[in-house]
Regions:
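Conserved pre-motif I regulatory segment
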Residues: 1-39
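Short hydrophobic/charged patches on amphipathic alpha-helices used for structural packing
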Residues: 25-26, 100-103, 128, 132
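Conserved SF1/SF2 helicase motif Ia
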Residues: 37-42, 47-86, 109-112, 141
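Alpha-helical scaffold elements adjacent to nucleotide-binding pockets in ATP/GTP-utilizing enzyme cores
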Residues: 75-80, 101-102, 130, 144
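Conserved helicase motor
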Residues: 90-100, 118-123
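Conserved motor-coupling elements within RecA-like helicase/translocase cores
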Residues: 99-114
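SF2 helicase catalytic motif II
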Residues: 111-112, 119-145
Length: 145
C-alpha cells in the first residue's frame, strides 16, 4: 500500500485517488479480474498505469493495453515517457512506432506498458508470439481492453 501511494504521489504527481480507483488498483495487484466503467476523463488509465509500476504486487511484468484509438495511444505513451515510464506502442499503421528496438524491449519484457491496436493484437503473429512468450515466462502482468 505504501508503494502504491508513493507511485501516485511521486510519479503521477497526484495527492489522492478518485472514487473507485484505489479499489481497482488493489484488485489488479492481487491478480483479480477488474472491470472499470468510468466516463471520459474519469481516471481509468491510472487504474492500469499505476499497477504497471508496482513491483510488490502479485502481478509483475508488462501491461498490454488494447486500444483502437491511435491518437490516444500516442498521447498516453508520450505522457508515460515524460514520466520516465518504459512504454511503447504498435498500431495497425506500423511505421516509426514499429522500430526494432521497441519490439526487442517488448519481447524481452523490458517495457512496463505496451499499447496495441486491436488489429496488431489479433492479426500480427509476431505480437501474439511475444505475448505468449511473456505469458509463459510470467512476464505478462495484465491485459487491458
Amino acid at each position: 500500500m505504501d508503494e502504491v501511494h508513493s507511485i501516485l504521489n511521486n510519479v503521477f504527481k497526484l495527492k489522492s485517488f478518485r472514487a473507485n480507483q484505489l479499489e481497482a488498483v488493489l484488485a489488479t495487484l492481487l491478480n483479480k479480474d477488474v472491470f472499470v466503467l468510468m466516463p471520459t476523463g474519469g481516471g481509468k488509465s491510472l487504474c492500469y498505469q499505476l499497477p504497471a509500476l508496482v513491483k510488490s504486487g502479485a502481478t509483475k511484468g508488462t501491461t498490454v493495453v488494447i486500444s483502437p484509438l491511435i491518437s490516444l495511444m500516442q498521447d498516453q505513451v508520450q505522457h508515460l515517457l515524460a514520466k520516465n515510464i518504459k512504454a511503447g506502442m504498435f498500431s495497425s499503421k506500423g511505421g516509426n512506432d514499429d522500430n526494432k528496438h521497441t519490439i526487442h524491449l517488448f519481447r524481452e519484457g523490458f517495457l512496463d506498458i505496451v499499447y496495441l491496436s486491436p488489429e496488431r493484437a489479433n492479426k500480427s503473429n509476431a505480437m501474439q508470439t511475444i505475448m505468449t512468450k511473456l505469458y509463459n515466462n510470467n512476464q505478462l502482468a495484465r491485459v487491458v481492453i
